[in-house]
Amino acid sequence: MKKSQFNSLIKEGYNHIPLSRGVVVDTDTPLALYLKLANNPYSYFLESVQGGEKWGRYSFIGLAAETVIKVNDYEVRIEKNGKIVHKYEVEDPLAWIEEYQNQFKVPQLDSLPDFNGGLVGYFGYEIVRYIEPKLANINKTDELNVPDILLMVSNDLLVVDNLTSKVHIITHVNPNDESLEDCLLYTSPSPRDS
């Protein structure tokens, strides 16, 4: 991305801008890339299959997330690098997550797949208590001791284009971040990327 395009996106009000660099990787499979680069807690590997028979075009490899959101019994915890930095008691965890997500203004760029980061994780069966008022007060023993909701803020990922063997290395930056110049330098096209 050129600096002029980046500045234009800032003027349009975007505050979570994906910067990317593409490289051709024709000797590693998406799974091999995951095992080499992201096989850590709070990382993920998503493959797609169409119709149960054909591989989808993209594979998504989320590098270890710095920020993780956990919800249990109307309590929302935000962890950064494994430490709780915020804890809230909320009336509606799903509304809270929607509000949290709305703080990120992310442009959709033609050069990237539709999914290029965001909230990734799970919503467990127990969230029905947050949706159906009649079930809100049912106390059930938590045998698994896992959050009702766990979401990773996926800022850094690889998107493997299985059709072209190209890997998009993506990081999302906030225009107010101090390391912005380093990110722009890193993602600027080099002569060999042509």
Where are the regions a protein language model picked out?
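A cross-family signal for N-terminal binding/gating loops and helix N-caps
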Residues: K3-T141, N145-L184
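Conserved small/polar residues in nucleotide/adenosyl-binding loops
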Residues: Y186-D193
